[in-house]
C-alpha cells in the first residue's frame, strides 16, 4: 500500500489557518517511518488524515490529494479507511470498546469473523506478548495508564490491515515494556510486510530497532525527510527542539564531532573507538562530588498498604520520605502502584494500613480540599483534569475558587501562560488543542496555585523536548527559588536523570530502592527488577571501560544542568 500526499493542505473548521500545509510525501509499501516534530506541529493531524478520522469524524477543508494505493481517500468512507489503517491512538481512553481487556482485544477478530476457538488462542497469545495475560477479565477502565496503552497495542496487533499507525505508543510505557513494544512493532513489520508509521517524541526509544526514514514536521510542513543516520548527525534535531539520544548528548558534551559515516543513529552501530580519548578526558576533568541533601522532612510515608479488591495488595508496606525542597522521582513498572500512591496522598483513596504525614501532621486529619491547598497534582491524562471550555478559565479556576481578585487572577494566569508557551492560545477553546498542548494547560492550572508539594504524573508524556524543557526549567526555578518540593512519576529516564536528585523505585507492590539517581542508574540488576532499563549513558560508560559508572552519570547530569 503506497501512501501519497500531493500538495495536501488541511484546515480544521475551528481554526483560521491550515494545520497541514502543502504536504508532499510518499511512503512506500512495507516501509517503516517515524514522524517527529514539536507539539502542535501537525503529526496527529497527518495521522488522522490517513486513518480517515479526518475528514469523516473531524471536519475541515482539504485541498490537494491523499492517495492510498492509487485511490484518492475522498472516494472512500470511514469504514473503508479503518480497514486499511489500524491505529493506536494517543489518548487510549477513547479507543476501548470491550467490557474487559480480552473482549477489547477480540473486537477486531470478531469483525474479521474469526472462529471462536481460534479467537481465544489468538487473544491469549497476543495478550502474552504485551504481558496482559493475567488481567484479561479486568475492565480496561480499571487499568493503570501504561496497562491501557498495552491493551491498545494488543488490539492493533490482531487487526488485519495493511498500514499500522502508532500515535505516541511509548508515552505511558515503562522503559522495558517500551522496548518490548518496539520489538513487537519490528517483528510485525518484518513478518507481515505491513507499512508502519510511528509518531513519537521519544526518538531514542523508537530507534531501539531500525527504521527506514524519519520525517520531521514543523508548523504543518515537512522540514526533513531522511535516514536516521543523516538526521542524528545533522543539527536539525537541536534546531527544531527535538531531543537527541542520550549517548549523542554525552558525546557532544565531551566535544566529539559526529558525522553520518559514524552511523550514529543506533548505539550498536556507532563506531566508539574513535571517541574514547575525548570521552575519558572529559570525564576526568569534569567530575564533581554530590551535594548533600537538605534533611528537613516534608512528607513521610509510613508502612503504606492498599488493595483495590481486598485480595491483592497494590501497595505493600511502602515507606519513604521526601525532604523540603527536594526534586525526587518515583519509578517502576506499569501497574506497580505509583499513581495509587498519588491518590492516597491526595485523599481520593484511604490507606488500608499505614500513614502519610506532611509537615509533621497526619494527612488522615485533612480533607481532600485541605490537602489540595498544599499539594498540587497533575494527572497522567490531561482529559481527566480539564473541566472548562476555555483555556483562560481552566487555568484561572483554582485561583477563583480561592476568592482571589480578578485583576490578580488575570496577571497570574498571563504569567503562567507565557511560561508554559501557551500565551497565543489564551482565547482558544481547549478542544482545539493537541494532546501535548492540553497536557501543558493542566500543568499550568496547577503551577499557577504555587503548591508546597507539586506532584507531576508523567509530565513529559506527549511533550516535545523544547516545550518540556521550558516547563521543567520553570518547575526547577520554583524548586530552587521558592523551595517548592517536586515529586515526579515518570517512565522518561532522560527526564529523571536531568532533573531529579533521588529516585524511589517500586516493584511488585514494594519499595525496591531509594537512592541518588546516578546510583540507581548504574545498577542493571536493580533496574531489571523494576522493568527499567539501563540508559545509553550507562552503555556508553560501560563500552568505554569506565569503572565508576555512577560518577560518569553524575558528570553528565551536572553538565546538562549547567548548560540549560
Ligand atoms: N479537533 C481539532 N480541532 C481544531 N484544531 C485542532 C484539532 N486537533 C488539533 N488541532 C490543532 O492542530 C494543530 C496540530 O495538532 P496535532 O494534534 O496534529 O499536533 P501534534 O504534532 O500531533 O502535537 P502533539 O505532539 O502535542 O500531539 C494544533 O495547533 C491544534 O491546535
Ligand atoms: N480504579 C481501579 N480499580 C481497580 N484496580 C485498579 C484501579 N486503578 C488501578 N488499579 C490497579 O492497581 C494497580 C496499580 O495501578 P497504578 O495506576 O497505581 O499503577 P502505576 O504504577 O501508576 O502504573 P503506570 O506506570 O502504568 O501509570 C494496577 O494493577 C491497576 O490495574
Curated annotation (Swiss-Prot):
It is a peripheral membrane protein. Its main location: membrane. Transmembrane segments: none annotated. It comes from the Bacteria. ATP 1 binds at residues 37-44. Its EC number is 7.-.-.-. It is found in: Cell inner membrane. ATP 2 binds at residues 332-339. The keyword Cell inner membrane applies. CDD domains: ABC_cobalt_CbiO_domain1. Residues 3-244, 299-533 form the ABC transporter domain. GO terms for molecular function: ATP binding; ATP hydrolysis activity; ATPase-coupled transmembrane transporter activity. Pfam families: ABC_tran, DUF3744. GO terms for cellular component: ATP-binding cassette (ABC) transporter complex. Keywords: ATP-binding, Cell inner membrane, Cell membrane, Membrane, Nucleotide-binding, Repeat, Translocase, Transport. SMART domains: AAA (SM00382). It is an enzyme of class 7 (translocase). Probably part of an ABC transporter complex. Responsible for energy coupling to the transport system. Belongs to the ABC transporter superfamily. NCBIfam families: PRK13648.1 (NF010167). This is Putative ABC transporter ATP-binding protein PBPRA2240. It comes from Photobacterium profundum (strain SS9).
Amino acid at each position: 500500500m503506497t501512501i501519497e500526499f500531493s500538495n495536501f493542505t488541511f484546515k480544521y473548521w475551528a481554526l483560521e489557518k491550515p494545520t497541514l500545509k502543502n504536504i508532499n510525501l510518499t511512503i512506500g509499501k512495507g516501509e517503516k517511518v517515524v514522524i517527529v516534530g514539536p507539539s502542535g506541529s501537525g503529526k496527529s493531524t497527518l495521522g488522522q488524515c490517513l486513518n480517515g478520522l479526518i475528514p469523516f469524524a473531524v471536519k475541515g477543508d482539504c485541498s490537494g490529494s491523499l492517495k492510498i494505493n492509487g485511490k484518492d481517500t475522498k472516494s472512500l468512507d470511514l469504514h473503508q479507511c479503518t480497514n486499511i489503517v489500524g491505529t493506536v491512538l494517543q489518548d487510549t481512553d477513547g479507543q476501548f470498546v470491550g467490557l474487559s481487556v480480552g473482549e477489547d482485544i477480540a473486537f477486531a477478530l470478531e469483525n474479521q469473523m474469526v472462529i471462536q476457538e481460534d479467537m481465544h488462542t489468538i487473544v491469549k497469545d497476543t495478550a502474552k506478548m504485551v504481558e496482559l495475560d493475567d488481567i484479561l477479565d479486568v475492565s480496561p477502565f480499571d487499568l493503570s495508564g501504561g496497562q491501557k496503552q498495552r491493551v491498545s497495542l494488543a488490539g492493533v496487533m490482531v487487526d488485519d490491515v495493511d498500514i499500522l499507525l502508532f500515535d505516541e505508543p511509548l508515552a505511558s510505557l515503562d522503559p522495558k515494556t517500551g522496548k518490548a513494544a518496539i520489538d513487537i512493532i519490528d517483528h510485525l513489520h518484518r513478518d507481515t510486510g505491513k507499512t508502519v508509521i510511528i509518531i513519537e517524541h521519544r526518538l531514542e526509544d523508537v530507534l531501539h530497532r531500525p527504521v527506514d526514514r524519519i520525517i520531521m514536521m514543523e508548523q504543518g510542513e515537512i522540514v526533513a525527510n531522511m535516514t536516521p543516520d543523516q538526521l542524528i548527525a545533522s543539527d536539525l534535531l537541536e534546531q527544531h527542539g527535538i531531543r537527541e539520544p542520550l549517548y549523542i548528548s554525552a558525546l557532544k558534551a565531551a566535544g566529539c564531532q559526529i558525522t553520518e559515516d559514524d552511523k550514529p543513529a543506533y548505539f550498536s552501530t556507532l563506531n566508539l573507538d574513535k571517541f574514547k580519548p575525548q570521552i575519558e578526558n572529559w570525564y576526568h576533568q569534569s567530575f564533581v562530588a554530590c551535594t548533600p541533601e537538605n534533611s528537613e522532612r516534608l512528607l513521610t510515608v509510613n508502612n503504606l498498604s492498599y488493595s483495590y479488591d481486598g485480595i491483592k495488595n497494590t501497595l505493600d508496606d511502602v515507606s519513604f520520605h521526601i525532604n523540603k525542597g527536594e526534586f525526587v522521582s518515583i519509578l517502576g513498572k506499569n501497574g506497580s502502584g505509583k499513581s495509587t500512591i498519588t491518590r492516597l496522598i491526595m485523599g481520593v483513596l484511604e490507606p488500608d494500613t499505614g500513614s502519610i504525614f506532611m509537615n509533621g501532621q497526619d494527612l488522615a486529619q485533612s480533607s481532600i480540599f485541605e490537602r489540595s491547598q498544599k499539594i498540587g497534582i497533575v494527572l497522567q491524562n490531561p482529559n481527566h483534569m480539564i473541566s472548562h471550555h476555555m483555556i483562560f478559565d481552566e487555568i484561572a479556576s483554582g485561583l477563583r475558587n480561592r476568592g482571589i481578585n480578578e485583576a490578580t487572577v488575570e496577571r497570574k494566569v498571563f504569567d503562567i501562560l507565557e511560561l508554559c508557551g501557551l500565551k497565543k492560545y489564551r482565547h482558544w477553546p481547549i478542544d482545539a488543542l493537541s494532546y501535548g498542548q492540553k497536557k501543558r494547560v493542566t500543568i499550568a492550572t496547577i503551577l499557577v496555585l504555587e503548591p508546597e508539594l507539586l506532584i507531576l504524573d508523567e509530565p513529559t508524556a506527549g511533550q516535545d523536548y523544547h516545550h518540556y524543557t521550558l516547563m521543567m526549567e520553570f518547575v526547577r526555578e520554583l524548586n530552587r527559588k521558592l523551595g517548592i518540593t517536586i515529586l515526579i512519576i515518570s517512565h522518561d529516564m532522560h527526564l529523571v536523570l536531568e532533573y531529579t536528585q533521588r529516585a524511589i523505585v517500586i516493584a511488585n507492590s514494594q519499595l525496591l530502592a531509594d537512592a541518588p539517581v546516578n546510583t540507581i542508574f548504574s545498577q542493571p540488576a536493580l533496574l531489571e527488577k523494576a522493568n527499567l532499563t539501563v540508559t545509553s549513558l550507562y552503555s556508553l560508560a560501560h563500552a568505554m571501560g569506565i569503572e565508576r559508572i555512577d560518577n560518569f552519570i553524575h558528570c553528565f547530569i551536572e553538565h546538562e544542568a549547567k548548560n540549560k
